[in-house]
Amino acid sequence: NLSEKQVVKSYSRGMRMKLSMAVALSHNAEILILDEATSGLDPIVREEILDFLLDFMQDENHTILISSHILSDLEKVADYIAFINDGKVLFVEPKDELKENYGICTLSNEEVENLDEEAIIGRRIHSFGQELLVKRNLVPDGIRLQKPSIEDIMIYFVKGGKR
């Protein structure tokens, strides 16, 4: 829905993004590399772009490498999530497995001491105990775990025991 009569430099950011993708695909691109492709777009245009990306990825010969701070976009389109902080890769995991591999629990300080330190990714210390991001497979049965969001996982990986 781009206007042929409108001057390109007068296009909105969303229109320019649509044009950029059309140009990339006109070259029969098999890989798209996008940096903050949906940043600054209104929700309607953002959804259109994400739908376009999902359609593009239906062909197994197509790949998209997308850098984004909008985690809801990654939730919608990513198969794998790589998390890079200060130039260091903290994890690369299939999106669907990411939430299954980790859990959040709240334990007393005594209960935390009984956990294998290798199980703990990060912690928030409170007056009543600690909230932990843990590796599910290293936590004993009986500890109640909640599914973390991708944002939770990223925050705990970066903040660790600093909070």
PLM features: residue spans?
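ABC transporter nucleotide-binding domains
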Residues: 1-72, 76-85
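Short, surface-exposed beta-strand/loop "edge" segments at domain boundaries and coil↔beta transitions
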Residues: 32-36, 111-115, 138-142
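A generic structural signal for secondary-structure junctions
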Residues: 1, 103, 158-159
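C-terminal coupling/interaction segments
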Residues: 121-163
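ABC transporter nucleotide-binding domain
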Residues: 50-134
